[in-house]
Design a protein with these regions (language model features):
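Formylglycine-dependent sulfatase
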Residues: 1-220
Length: 220
């Protein structure tokens, strides 16, 4: 949204907002000999067009095409499908016998939706004013529709741990050489479902607990 005037809030299957021919800070660092990485919330799109992703193969163009040597990212945000990690442009833990399908136009037959099945929402209730009443993943309804990829789905309470672990490992692996690392946390972004060790600890509700979790990530 910040990079091009014709881009609003990107769907989870949007094409990449920053085109490969556009120079980036990551490109500049890489050209100067830095090892570059992008970890966490992405929401800049993947592939060359909306709906053009091969979710079950190598997704391109992607972070490697705009300057990043390594990437471990969400396709978009925590509240949009697909709810999976994408490492170096391939979905992590994907079972080829359970391929992923994604749509932002219509639901998949037989897949329950938050607006129709509130009894399946074991964590957060649907928020139809913002579109959070579609596909159900990890007991939370999302924006958009998806099916398959059950083995690859993230657990919201572990998102911060996943991002932090990957970021710390990247830093440790490259501490003796120049590196540039972009880390995008998802803590304050909906659905805000922090790890149990932070729940109720801030005294300021779920958002406060999520910010406490963010503080932990920065500290690590």
């Amino acid at each position: 949204a910040w990079r091009r005037n014709d881009t609003g809030i990107a769907a989870g299957n949007a094409g990449m907002v920053i085109r490969p021919e556009q120079p980036t800070v990551a490109d500049m660092f890489r050209e100067c000999g830095y090892t570059t990485g992008a970890i966490g919330k992405w929401h800049l799109g993947l592939s060359d067009r909306t709906g053009g992703q091969d979710w079950n193969g190598f997704i391109t163009p992607g972070p490697s095409d705009i300057g990043f040597d390594y990437s471990y990212i969400m396709a978009a945000t925590g509240d949009r499908v697909p709810c999976v990690w994408v490492e170096n442009q391939r979905i992590v833990n994907l079972d080829p016998n359970d391929p992923i399908e994604v749509s932002y136009e219509k639901p998949f037959p037989g897949e329950p939706l938050g607006k129709d099945h509130p009894e399946l929402l074991t964590k957060l209730k649907p928020s139809p004013n913002h579109g959070h009443d579609m596909a159900i993943v990890n007991g939370i309804s999302r924006i958009g529709y998806m099916k398959g990829g059950k083995q690859a789905l993230w657990e919201d309470e572990n998102i911060a741990d996943s991002i932090t672990c990957k970021a710390v490992r990247f830093i440790e692996n490259h501490k003796d050489e120049p590196f540039f690392l972009y880390v995008g946390t998802n803590d304050a972004h909906v659905p805000r479902w922090p790890h149990p060790r932070f729940v109720g600890k801030s005294g300021m509700g779920p958002r406060g607990d999520a910010l406490l979790q963010f503080d932990w990530t920065v500290g690590e």
